[in-house]
Amino acid sequence: MMSDLTPIFRKYVAVIDDARNEQNGIDDHVERKQEDFGNSNETCEMFRDSFIKECARLLKFLVELNKVIKQIEKNYLDDFNMSDAEKDEFDMECRLQIQQYFKKFEFLENYEMERHNLSLKRFQSKSHRWSKILSNKNDNTKHVIHPQDIENGVYEFRLGVLRCLNLWIKYVSSKFTTIQQERLILENKMNFNSTPMPTLSNNADDFSADAIDISVSQSAPVETVQDEVKHYEETISKLTQEQLQVLETEHSELLNQKNEQLKKVETINKTILDIVNIQNELSNHLTVQSQNINLMLNNQDDIELNIKKGNKELRKAKRAAGRTAKMTTYGAIIMGVFILFLDYVG
């Protein structure tokens, strides 16, 4: 009758498992130290760039330009302190500076987008390594933050910095546009006031030679208001009733013409303000839309990354299960042969 060797078999299996677990623990400890050292260096070097410094420089330039605009605004709107040539030169310089700052902002925005996408691809290519490290850390009851979460936090922070710069650029640009509009309004008013008076009728039948010689435009300069009133009364007394009617008609036509010009100027100013408001609204709307699109793209990248990571983990689990099944089968066969050998020897 065959003896019961099950207790001996269980002892052998326990000894083999203990030795294997001890060796795996030593190997995992050494490998974990090496990977922690390499990954800590990689995480530290991940954000070593001059993005924040460049953003700080751009913000400093915008603040300085805003100060310059505020300081020069009073002289800019005064014709006695600045000439038209100086104002045009200031407009050109300020416009060029704003364009350069906007290009710098676009460069920083594109750089951050490319850096974030490159970091996501790097995590995607090394996802198995990070998952192994995090699983070991969690087994040791240590709170660990995934490097991808750190990257997402840094990316959100930098997006906030870019939004702040965008608001500053819009504010400085709107300030510059406002003083340009005020200058345009003042110039239109001056042009309206300096419009030459229409000449009186040249018909010889309406005015005599004596009346033309003593007209107000050709009269001698007066020194006091009383002299001016006296001169005006003398001039009116020498004109005929028909001439007075003609002057009154021309005066009414001139007033109507000036009123029409004033209405046109007001309409133009209102149109300019409406255009500027629409431009600002469109700019804000486009900014919000671009931010929403960026968030959607980021969410899509995260979803794709999680799906690929899940597929890799699933394939890894399948391979591990297959290896475990094979090892179990081979172990059972070996143990069976070993038991038969012991039984044969016994």
From Swiss-Prot:
GO cellular component: cytoplasmic side of endoplasmic reticulum membrane; endoplasmic reticulum; Golgi to ER transport vesicle membrane; SNARE complex
Segments forming domain t-SNARE coiled-coil homology: 255-317
Major localization class: endoplasmic reticulum
Pfam family, one: Syntaxin-18_N
Cytoplasmic side: 1-324
Subcellular location: Endoplasmic reticulum membrane
Any single biological process term in GO: retrograde vesicle-mediated transport, Golgi to endoplasmic reticulum
Keywords recorded for this protein, A-Z: Coiled coil, Endoplasmic reticulum, ER-Golgi transport, Membrane, Protein transport, Transmembrane, Transmembrane helix, Transport
Transmembrane segments: 325-342
CDD domains: SNARE_syntaxin18
Membrane topology according to the record: Single-pass type IV membrane protein
Highest taxon above the source species: Eukaryota
UniProt keyword annotation of Mitochondrion present: no
MF GO annotations: SNAP receptor activity
Family named by the database record: Belongs to the syntaxin family.
Subunit structure comment from the entry: Component of a SNARE complex consisting of UFE1, USE1, SEC20 and SEC22 or YKT6.
Function statement: Syntaxin required for targeting and fusion of Golgi-derived retrograde transport vesicles with the ER.
Annotated PANTHER family: SYNTAXIN-18
Protein name: Syntaxin UFE1
Source organism: Saccharomyces cerevisiae (strain ATCC 204508 / S288c) (Baker's yeast)
